[in-house]
Amino acid sequence: SNGSNSSYLKEKFKTKSEMTAKLDLLEAIRKEIDRQLEGLTDYDKIKEVHNWLIDNIEYDVNLEADEPYSISGALTEGKAVCEGYARSFKYIMDELQIPCVLVSGTGTNSNGETESHAWNYVQLDGKWYAIDVTWDDPIILGNGYVTDDTYYKHFLKGQNTFFETHQPDGYLSQNSMEFTFPTISEEDYE
């Protein structure tokens, strides 16, 4: 994320027909994902969406996409920064009727550097857990062979592990309204 906070569904369109075409495409993608995941448990749906986003979005290091912070940049151009990954995850969870929130704050990367960042909390079996699809994407890690430990390093995590590298700030809008995020489980999902 570039440090600026923005509203959940913020897209830029040049014309009404462009907007309609993009929204139709996004809705088609969302409905197709929903159709393919029909009959799966919520855990499996969350895991499949996590994996699908990683497989279909490339981290936009050079901000080449028209909308790297948005759902349309992520899902229609296949390029996004953390905010695009997190917004897309929430967009699909909403379709699947799995409670999910977008979280902004700071992340401490493997070099010990702190940066503005965005991720999600998702509810499963009555408890909230953290998911950072962006940092689970191998392209962020330099592309080499990725083990499950790396691919799911930030998948359904509790406070005890997630807060070592992630600190929510409670702000998620341009007018700096403060939000209280759900309290996530202390332990990782088993």
Q: What function would you assign to each model-found segment?
A:
Residues S1-G3, E190:
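Intrinsically disordered, low-complexity N-terminal segments that are enriched in acidic
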Residues S4-Y8:
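Extended, well-ordered protein cores
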Residues K16-A74:
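Secondary-structure boundary elements
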Residues S17-A21, T76-A80, S104, N109-N111:
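Alpha-helix capping and helix-loop boundary segments enriched in small/acidic/polar residues
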Residues N56, D60-D66, T76-G78, G112-E115, ...:
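Repeated polar recognition positions within modular binding domains
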Residues I71-Y85:
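A short, highly charged nucleic-acid-interacting micro-segment common to nuclease
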Residues G84-Q159:
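Hydrophobic/aromatic-rich core segments of domains that either
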Residues G144-E190:
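Low-complexity, Gly/Ser/Thr/Pro-rich intrinsically disordered linker/tail segments
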